[in-house]
């Protein structure tokens, strides 16, 4: 386990927080949302990597390296970083990383290391998908002593709403929710059973490459969740998890209350991240509850910056399609040349 690097100097971070990278102000707590790439903002990327490793390591995961930055973060066509910035304390509250998929075979998807995508998923879903990952809140904003901590996750949703407005072609959100090895097995199994019961993947779109065997066919769970509807069984789930001295992970709770058509996939172990257990999920953007859309995707006060960023994503999307077209033309040309050689 390597020692985590020292914090990056505030002045270096602030120098990279230029106006064109700001998306919006948050609905609460007076914070700000920025997006950038590692190439654009190396100091911010370094600080994000430090804070991610610190937060994940404390929870029982992490890479074990001095900073959590991988090849997908730094690739030219890799992930964008979204951060919540506290202008009062001049520090990063938390963040996500995301990538906009524009084809059935996008590059640098973290989920492809652990999940197998069906042809249907690649063809009908991936080209219209935003992949999310590495959601974190820095340790200082996980305590009750910090008055802004209660808004940290809500602020991240403000940022996600802005990214969806930036990318109107996106119809799906795809990613993973994480549970750490310290999470009690009985609580985990009850939660996963509940998720699969109410948010099943009936089309078999995504499967774990090495899924965990969770024994979810045990009749115990049918007997346990005896309520007549989602709400009643949700209360039973809360009670069962509290009985194990655990709680529903905040991100899981947030996703469950975002859309009624969420889909839940297999759970896998991630050996590259402290053997945490990760469950794949998919959300359909048009099905997000109207009140959530109104809360997180409104335009007031941030229209100008979004216009500039939307144009950037549009150009990147066109460039990506051009690259795909050229690759297809090159393959067709090579195939034609091979055919001519055989004829000779």
Which ranges hold each PLM region?
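Short, cationic low-complexity segments
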Residues: 300-326
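Short amphipathic alpha-helix that is part of the acyltransferase structural core
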Residues: 24-74, 78-97
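A short helix-loop-beta-strand connector motif used in the catalytic cores of GNAT acetyltransferases and
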Residues: 73-83, 262-263, 273-279
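Conserved N-terminal entry element of GNAT/NAT acetyltransferase domains
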Residues: 1-39
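Short, basic, low-complexity termini and linkers enriched in Ser/Thr/Gly/Pro
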Residues: 327-344
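Long, continuous compositionally biased terminal/linker segments
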Residues: 85, 280-309
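Acyl-donor binding region in acyl/amide transferases
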Residues: 63, 103-262
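Short catalytic/ligand-binding loop motif for oxyanion handling, primarily in non-cytosolic enzymes
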Residues: 92, 140, 181-186, 273-276, ...
């Amino acid at each position: 386990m390597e020692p985590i690097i020292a914090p990056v100097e505030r002045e270096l971070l602030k120098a990279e927080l230029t106006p064109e990278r700001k998306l919006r102000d948050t609905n609460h707590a007076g914070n700000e949302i920025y997006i950038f790439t590692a190439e654009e903002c190396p100091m911010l990327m370094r600080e994000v990597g430090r804070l991610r490793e610190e937060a994940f390591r404390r929870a029982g995961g992490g890479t074990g390296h001095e900073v959590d930055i991988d090849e997908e973060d730094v690739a030219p066509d890799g992930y964008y970083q979204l951060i919540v910035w506290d202008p009062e304390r001049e520090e990063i509250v938390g963040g996500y990383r995301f990538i906009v998929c524009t084809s059935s075979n996008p590059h640098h998807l973290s989920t492809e290391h652990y999940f197998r995508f069906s042809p249907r998923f690649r063809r009908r879903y991936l080209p219209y998908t935003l992949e999310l990952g590495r959601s974190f809140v820095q340790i200082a904003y996980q305590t009750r002593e910090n008055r802004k901590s209660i808004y940290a996750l809500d602020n991240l949703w403000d940022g996600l709403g802005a990214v969806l407005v930036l990318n109107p072609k996106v119809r799906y959100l795809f990613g993973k929710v994480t549970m750490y090895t310290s999470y009690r097995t009985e609580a985990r199994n009850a939660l996963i059973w509940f998720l699969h019961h109410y948010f099943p993947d009936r089309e078999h779109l995504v499967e774990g490459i090495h899924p965990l065997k969770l024994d979810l066919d045990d009749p115990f769970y049918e007997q346990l969740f005896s309520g007549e509807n989602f709400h009643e069984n949700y209360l039973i789930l809360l009670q069962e998890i509290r009985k194990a001295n655990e709680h529903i992970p905040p991100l899981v709770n947030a996703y469950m209350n975002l859309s009624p058509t969420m889909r839940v996939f297999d759970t896998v172990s991630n050996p590259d991240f402290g053997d945490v257990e990760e469950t794949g999920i998919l959300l359909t953007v048009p099905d997000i509850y109207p009140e959530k859309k109104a809360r997180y995707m409104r335009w007031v006060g941030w229209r100008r910056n979004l216009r500039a960023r939307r144009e950037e994503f549009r150009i990147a999307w066109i460039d990506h399609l051009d690259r795909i077209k050229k690759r297809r033309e090159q393959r067709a040309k090579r195939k034609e040349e091979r055919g001519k050689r055989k004829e000779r």
